[in-house]
Amino acid sequence: MDTMSNQPRRRFLQATAALGATVAMPAAWSQAAKWPAKPIRIVVAFPPGGLTDAYARLYADQLTAKYGQPVVVDNRPGAGAVIGIEAVAKSPPDGYTLLMTTSGTVWQNRVLYTKLPYNLDKDLTPIALFPSGPLVVGVPDKVPARTMKEFIAFAKTNPTNMGTYAPGSYPHMVADQVNRSDGTKIVSVHYRGEAPMWVDVASGQLQIAIGSYQAFNTVSTRGVRPIGVTGLYRSPKLPDVPTLV
């Protein structure tokens, strides 16, 4: 199989690296013509409304503006990002199908699943990383907790469900760790992404969730209250909300 010539490959890598996205593509790149010569597809392993989707759409707009080719965002949520990853891994290795997902789900799936429909080492090539930021811990107004400490006390005496945006994701691990260290019985409820998770927090079906500020902000005026942020420092967007550290 012919490999892509150095100049088009360099153009592609420069475009992706400059935008700082978490992007992967099929491992073998066989396109020999100038890139891009046709529309590009970005597969997002989560539904619309979350941070990963927002990054993909911003990235798509920038690529279109730079190269004049249409860039389509294709949301393929489900199975902890396996569906989206598989769609890209089995696409033609021509540089026109990209994957946008979270690094956590990519690597943790190797541990969670005994068999995957793709080989991460052979079928995909990492291209770039996007910057990460603190996550927001939010509860519905009917939960009386104002801090994580108060929430843990609440969870010890009340049935508690916690939303996660994928099995094995960071929120899933937090729930498991709190159960182990504090004796709670928080039940993790897995969603196909952040957007539907936060909607269920707002409706009161979930007692707590952890996710990006961008997705949390869509329900912040609909009865969801932040009680903490991850990371070492407070978020400039939520300066009155304490960190979990």
Name each model-derived stretch.
Residues 25-42, 92-96, 152-161, 221:
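Immediate post-signal peptide segment of exported/extracytoplasmic ligand-binding proteins
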Residues 42-55, 77-79, 163-170:
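Extracytoplasmic "Venus flytrap"
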Residues 91-100, 158-160, 184, 202-209, ...:
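Alpha-to-beta junction loops
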Residues 76-84, 133, 189-199, 214:
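Short helix-initiation/N-cap motifs at beta->coil->alpha
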Residues 132, 215-245:
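C-terminal lobe and pocket-closing loops
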Residues 1-25:
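N-terminal secretory signal peptides
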Residues 90-96, 111-196, 244:
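Hinge/capping helix and adjacent helix->loop/strand transition within the periplasmic-binding protein
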Residues 100-105, 109, 194, 210-216, ...:
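Beta->alpha turn/N-cap motifs
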